[in-house]
Amino acid sequence: MAKAPKRAFVCNECGADYPRWQGQCSACHAWNTITEVRLAASPTVARNERLSGYAGSAGVSKVQKLSDISLEELPRFSTGFKEFDRVLGGGVVPGSAILIGGNPGAGKSTLLLQTLCKLAEQMKTLYVTGEESLQQVAMRAHRLGLPTANLNMLSETSIEQICLIAEEEQPKLMVIDSIQVMHMADIQSSPGSVAQVRETAAYLTRFAKTRGVAIVMVGHVTKDGSLAGPKVLEPCIDCSVLLDGDADSRFRTLRSHKNRFGAVNELGVFAMTEQGLREVSNPSAIFLSRGDEVTSGSSVMVVWEGTRPLLVEIQALVDHSMMANPRRVAVGLEQNRLAILLAVLHRHGGLQMSDQDVFVNVVGGVKVTETSADLALLLAMVSSLRDRPLPQDLVVFGEVGLAGEIRPVPSGQERISEAAKHGFRRAIVPAANVPKKPPEGMQVFGVKKLADALSVFDDL
């Protein structure tokens, strides 16, 4: 007589396990997120035999001295997109597990289909689709004008069958589209559930490590823009990237949130065209599409995205409020940071905006999280309040403290050099970031306090 399947209760938000149902998850403190899942009494023998030895070789693992382990780096291979390679840390590492997420229509499947069609001419690849039919994928490839002669396709949702076929085909790169529709026979729950997503991702990661196959898994996102699935999915994978972009914009940004083989928060920029995604080699140019007319409330700053500087424009609109509680709206910037800077501007700059509506926006849909944008945001708000434009050739960056001091930011010299490459001739930066030898033709103003920055602005 077969044993009854085991039951478990798992949180949909963080993946914590519980022996019985409860209203609130004690790990992430979310309410009504714990659901029941059914597990098989024991895993199949074939599954354990096929994928024993997680860290790279089948069989029983052996204890080794750290000094005896080879330091030879695994050879990476290019995806065919320099921007994609940059986000991955220099290319794809064999045996790595990569998770790519994004909103519907962002271009995840298009980017991966273009990548595999390019690589199929050099190496063996496999594209596994569980959401679209093979005919639909073929029509999309034909519409984009991609070479399809050497690309291997598979329509399957069973992870066990996919790994068996992949073991026969032995591809160097395999795409799973998507992880939410895959399932395992051992897990008696519907595809897309917490248990299925967690176990299928762990199963694929184990297969990638033991067989040396690089696997890219496509994942959906939730309402708040985070990758769908439990938090325990993150330790299973080596690299997590997110493809983002506004529905009314043709530009897409690819950002890494976790990378064991490269820098985190690395940014790649693509443009959606009729021939698919095309990489943008100079992202600063698209984020600085300023008109010839000089307007108030606009400033340019240099943010540091991963391993490269990026010039972005910050716009501010300060207007008299007709309501008792003035509005404070921030797009692309943190709302709490805006409130702090308004208080600092009032206390240490002598400018009161308690009766003003304040709207700030980062042009191009870029999300700026680093504090180096503080000084540029403050000067943009002052420019809008006074209706006095900042010079077109001025770049600003620096962190503003609660005492009104201007703090230095990392990579100040590189930021100034990047601004000089794009034709900027003046810069307001923290005094500690002033280079000993500024770029030729660049005038750098070092400021220590907010009052110093406002004084420089008055003299420009």
Regions found by a protein language model. Give the residues of each.
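Peripheral, non-AAA+ core regions of ATP-driven protein-machinery
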Residues: 2-13, 17-86, 93-99, 106-117, ...
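Conserved Rossmann-like nucleotide-cofactor binding loop
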Residues: 132-133
